[in-house]
């Protein structure tokens, strides 16, 4: 169980970014963090991972408060995948092995090699282990970063717009892999994503932020005309969720249907 309680954050000398954010997420779910630009979506993930230090509040995994742990201990519980993938000459294998750093005390162990091998096998990267990241496509590099995150053996996976620079085929692939990790391995995942249709297709929980606060939280039933108007400024009378696709019906079309 992931439990975020009254999380607040503001930049020095600036306006509050997160305003008393609270929600609970059960193990094995895939949560989409949604909202307009500047409402605190990425900031929320970074506070949960202690990349940023929250002003107040708590973030607990199975009762353990992440905000009181060292960065090394957090990295054993939480993996973070950013939007931008390093363009480096590091090999695929070496990049995935970086996910084992929080556990290393006296060098690389046989267990480390086993975990890395399994992560690469799960992401179908075994044949690419010796290739350099700067020779890979954007979709391939993002799969490598997912493998590195998986090598951390985390409880919680945080993804900050990992699909924003990918074509639609690679977006689907990355999101499908993440959903499979939740379903098959009991991982819990949160993703910052802008495409509502993609979110509805792959995620099963949704957190709508507005002005840094929780506007709505739950399943697909949270989406209606009021939600899209208040959060995104989209106007219309009805919002239907049809086959994981949002359909907005304006007033004129509604009259035609009736």
Predicted regions located by residue number:
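The feature captures the beta-strand-to-loop junction immediately N-terminal to the Walker
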Residues: 34-36
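Conserved ABC ATPase "signature" region
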Residues: 110-128, 153
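ABC ATPase nucleotide-binding domains
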Residues: 231-258
């Amino acid at each position: 169980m992931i439990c975020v309680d009254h999380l607040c954050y503001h930049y020095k000398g600036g306006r509050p970014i997160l305003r008393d954010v609270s929600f609970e997420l059960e193990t094995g779910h895939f949560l989409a963090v949604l909202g307009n630009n500047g409402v605190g979506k990425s900031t929320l993930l970074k506070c949960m991972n202690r990349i940023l230090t929250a002003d107040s509040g708590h973030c607990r995994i199975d009762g353990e408060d992440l905000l009181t742990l060292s960065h090394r201990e957090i990295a054993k519980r939480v993996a973070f995948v950013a939007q931008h993938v390093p363009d480096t000459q590091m090999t695929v294998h070496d990049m995935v092995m970086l996910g084992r750093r929080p556990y290393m005390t006296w060098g690389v162990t046989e267990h480390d090699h086993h975990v890395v091998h399994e992560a690469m096998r799960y992401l179908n990267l075994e044949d690419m282990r010796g290739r350099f990241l700067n020779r890979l496509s954007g979709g391939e590099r993002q799969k490598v970063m997912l493998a590195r995150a998986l090598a951390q053996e985390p409880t919680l996976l945080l993804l900050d717009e990992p699909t924003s620079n990918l074509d639609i085929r690679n977006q689907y692939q990355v999101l499908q892999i993440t959903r499979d990790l939740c379903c098959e391995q009991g991982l819990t995942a949160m993703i910052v994503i802008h495409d509502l249709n993609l979110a509805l297709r792959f995620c099963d929980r949704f957190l709508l932020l507005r002005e840094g606060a929780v506007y709505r939280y739950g399943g697909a039933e949270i989406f209606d005309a009021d939600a899209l108007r208040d959060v995104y400024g989209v106007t219309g009378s009805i919002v239907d969720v049809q086959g994981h696709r949002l359909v907005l019906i304006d007033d004129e079309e509604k009259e035609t249907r009736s």
